[in-house]
A protein has these predicted regions:
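Secreted/periplasmic carbohydrate-active enzymes, especially glycoside hydrolases
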Residues: 1-11, 21-337, 341-347, 384, ...
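Substrate-binding/catalytic cleft of secreted carbohydrate-active enzymes
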Residues: 328-444
């Protein structure tokens, strides 16, 4: 039975003010992707043919200019019995304000910042039949202090919000790199596929891929079995050589992309498809504080830029910036996925940035003098930084990651954020322009 959270509103207000830490477990950080039922739909991003996909456009139930809860938006979704063997995820972006999520009257997340597209695992909170999903706009002072100077996106409210379900035995995350071999003769695909078995029983799945060169030629394909115990995750690693690849090295002057399709099979039956564009690119940094591509320093002409209201306008503006000699864009916060797709295709570098901007008290290094040194905000900092990284990691245009806009102070939270990104083993630079000689930046 659906349960509206609008009716017991006082309960909602109290829960938002004192959310249990366990609720935060619904939110996850991983590569942004959808599972398509057909290969052609995957290639063309045709979502209307995805059987278990629901667009989210909730209606306003409550609004106020005062208090901790400023608005409540609700939508009733119907979960059929056929979803029992699937994991359901809620993707949110373009909410317009900081918010939290309720499902059937139960709060499942801490407050989420309005700037970072997010994903939540909602299966444990759904019932068979009608369910009420609520997006509750909140006014939490600490949220605004973490992101003081970041403008709200100009896109339509709730655009690209959706629920989709993927099989309980399926791909959970993917890390893709196309890197040169040790002698720079050709490329090697580094494809790490994290597989999840949410069943209690032992299961076997087939995971496959095929990769096509920029000219459309099939380069390689493979299908492997993976036996998994119940309630477990494992990673399949593929490392095939990709020959005749040096002419396809990705750069603004040569933005060539390979097409990679991941898919899963069970008992010979194709289950799900996931498409990716992959660029042959290797980035790092040297001891002179320069970002490098294939070991050579890049000469960057950088511009601050956030995506426009829609994809077509953004592509037009990015092309115009490139025509003026700009070769690197620096957004102030994570962008819609199509922004990175555009930059991959058009050929322009991007230094991505977490949704952190706290100039107030930036010079105060006492505890809580700056948000960056308020330990009770650590979880919010780490989630913003990790989500930024996971969403952008597979794009050829991404040459480095910024912990925060500067100045945003420095301290415990940004130290831990730097350590977190370093733990992922990425060769790309981690930058914080407000480090002021401290150790939590690779480039000063």
């Amino acid at each position: 039975m659906k349960k509206s959270i609008y009716l017991p509103f006082l309960v909602v207000a109290l829960m938002v003010a004192a959310v249990d830490a366990a609720f935060a477990q619904a939110r996850i950080a991983r590569t942004e992707f959808l599972c398509y039922d057909k290969r052609e739909d995957a290639k063309r991003d045709i979502r209307t043919q995805i059987d278990k996909y629901i667009a989210i456009a909730p209606t306003l139930q409550f609004q106020s200019d005062e208090g901790g809860v400023r608005a409540v938006y609700e939508q009733v979704i119907t979960v059929p019995a056929s979803w029992n063997d699937y994991n359901a995820y809620l993707h949110t972006e373009n909410i317009g304000n900081d918010y939290t999520i309720f499902v059937n009257g139960r709060q499942i997340s801490r407050p989420i910042d309005k700037h970072t597209p997010s994903e939540l695992f909602i299966s444990p909170y759904l019932d068979q039949g009608d369910n009420t999903v609520a997006i509750v706009v909140v006014a939490e002072p600490y949220m605004s202090t973490i992101a003081e100077d970041i403008a709200t996106s100009p896109r339509t409210q709730f655009s690209n919000c959706y629920i989709f379900a993927q099989r309980k035995l399926g791909i959970y995350d993917v890390n893709i790199r196309l890197l040169p071999d040790s002698l720079n003769r050709f490329a090697q695909l580094h494809l790490d596929v994290e597989v999840d078995n949410s069943f209690s029983t032992d299961e076997t799945i087939e995971v496959g891929y095929d990769i096509y060169a920029p000219d459309g030629k099939l380069i390689d394909y493979s299908v492997n079995d993976l036996a998994m115990t119940g309630f477990s995750r494992d990673t399949m690693r593929f490392k095939p050589w990709v020959y005749h690849s040096n002419p396809n090295r990705w750069s603004p002057a040569n933005p060539k992309l390979y097409d990679l399709m991941l898919y899963t099979k069970r008992n010979g039956i194709l289950w799900e498809y996931m498409p990716f564009k992959v660029g042959f690119a290797e980035y790092g940094y040297n001891d002179k504080g320069q970002i490098t591509a294939f070991g050579q320093p890049l000469q960057l002409k950088e511009s601050r830029y956030n995506a426009a209201a829609d994809r077509a306008t953004t592509e037009k503006e990015v092309k115009a910036l490139k025509a003026k000699g700009i070769n690197c864009l620096s957004p102030t916060h994570p962008q819609p996925q199509w922004f990175y797709d555009i930059c991959d295709k058009v050929g322009i570098y991007v230094i991505d940035c977490a949704a952190i901007s706290s100039p107030t008290g930036a010079d105060d290094r006492t505890i809580a003098g700056t948000s960056a040194n308020a330990p009770w905000l650590l979880e919010d900092y780490l989630m913003r930084v990790e989500t930024m990284y996971r969403r952008a990691q597979n794009h050829a245009c991404i040459i480095a990651f910024r912990l925060a806009n500067a100045p945003s102070g420095n301290g415990y939270n940004l130290y831990k954020a730097y350590e977190l990104l370093k733990s992922f083993g990425d060769t790309r630079a981690i930058i914080y322009d407000g480090a002021e000689g401290e150790w939590n930046t690779d480039i000063e």
